[in-house]
Amino acid sequence: MNHPSATLLQRAQWLGYLGLVPFITGMALMILLDDTRLVAQAIHNYAAVILTFVGAIHWGRALNNGDTTLMSFSVLPSLIAWCSLFLEPQKGIPLTAIAFVMLLFLDRNLYLEMAWFKQLRTRLSILVCTLLSVSWLYI
């Protein structure tokens, strides 16, 4: 799938950017509200869910390629996300942001043949980390 159909590419982009809506909404609420505890927790929870989702991409690829090493690695993001939920958002949000960056570096090396995917993942990861960072500033 080095050259996806235009429909697949558009759908991946549309759904990827749609996944940013909770981060954008959460960040806006963090800026606007005086009491941000509930919003910070919601952002943290959503970041953990999305981190798990991004890790699951590797699970799918491992199943497709029969790569047991990649399959074993694919559960690490969900474990990091789960562990982060035991922390307060002021510590858990940065942990998930760091995990997103680490996962991005891995993806950029694993998906060399899929330039479109690398580009989309890079853009989405930068936006997610930026939105998480700005939200964190308002905790």
What are these regions (language model features)?
Residues 28-32, 61-62, 79-88, 110, ...:
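Hydrophobic alpha-helical transmembrane segments
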Residues 39-43, 69, 116-123:
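Non-cytosolic membrane-interface motifs at loop->transmembrane helix junctions
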